[in-house]
Design a protein with these regions (language model features):
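Conserved catalytic core of the tyrosine transesterase superfamily
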Residues: 1-243
Length: 243
């Protein structure tokens, strides 16, 4: 933070300001943005550093608070547009996972490919985080009405309806196939040893099919979540419903 504070003081000297006040501090941050071209995150760090420094001066030296009104402001970082996959990229990703299932050369590969195909479908169809997919249990899914209970951040639960009959069929197929892997847990998705599939394993499954389908090489599993939300909005869903 020392460099941030020194930067402010150096700039004040160069501008010949008589004193440091709310207006001059605002001019400094405008300078950082317009003249220096700093990103919002870098500006926010300087903002926090100077706010702490000025509060220190206020407490230690009883500086008049009128000069530090800016420290109570909210500094907003503009959000970047969410990164998504195109419709064609999503089709490629799902098609590759389905093709690998169809081309399975052994029972062992068939079991794993069934699971992987189902994971890719669910990540997009429901807009799941990979942590949510990893934490799913067998009894979270109700095949009769094709609903699934999701446990999100902060222990929040939401009951989702799987609208695609094809995805429901693939999920039912996986549940049957899962029994062949001698499960040792109630987890919906398991590894070859029968244990719960980890978040890192689900990440690797996504990256495998990402590379095989020749889509955006920088795509992460979260792209599917953003793509799901984007499609909902494009189809008329309200922003609050999507959130």
């Amino acid at each position: 933070y020392r460099c941030d504070i020194n930067g402010l003081l150096t700039w004040f000297h160069s501008q010949n300001f008589a004193n440091i006040n709310d207006s001059s501090v605002s001019s400094y941050f405008l300078y950082l943005q317009k003249e220096c071209g700093l990103q919002a995150k870098s500006i926010r760090r300087k903002y926090v550093a100077l706010g702490q420094y000025f509060n220190f001066l206020k407490l230690e030296y009883n500086i008049n608070e009128i000069f530090f009104r800016f420290t109570s402001r909210k500094f907003h970082i503009p959000r970047n547009l969410p990164k998504t996959l195109s419709n064609q990229e999503i089709k490629n990703l799902i098609s590759v996972s389905a093709a690998e299932y169809q081309d399975s050369t052994s029972d062992y590969k068939r079991r794993l490919n069934t699971r992987n195909m189902c994971i890719i479908e669910l990540l997009f169809c429901l807009g799941l985080r990979i942590g949510e997919a990893a934490s799913l249990n067998l009894d979270d899914y109700c095949p009769e009405d094709c609903t699934i209970l999701i446990r999100g951040k902060g222990s929040r639960e939401r009951l989702l309806f799987i609208s695609s009959p094809i995805v429901c069929q693939k999920l039912n197929l996986w549940i049957q196939t899962r029994l062949e892997m001698s499960p040792t847990t109630t987890a919906l998705f398991i590894n070859r040893y029968g244990d719960r599939l980890s978040i890192y394993s689900i990440e690797n499954i996504f990256y495998k099919y990402r590379d095989l389908s020749n889509i955006n090489p920088n795509a992460t599993p979260h792209y599917l979540r953003h793509s799901f939300a984007t499609q909902l909005l494009n189809n008329g869903a309200g922003i609050r419903d999507v959130q």
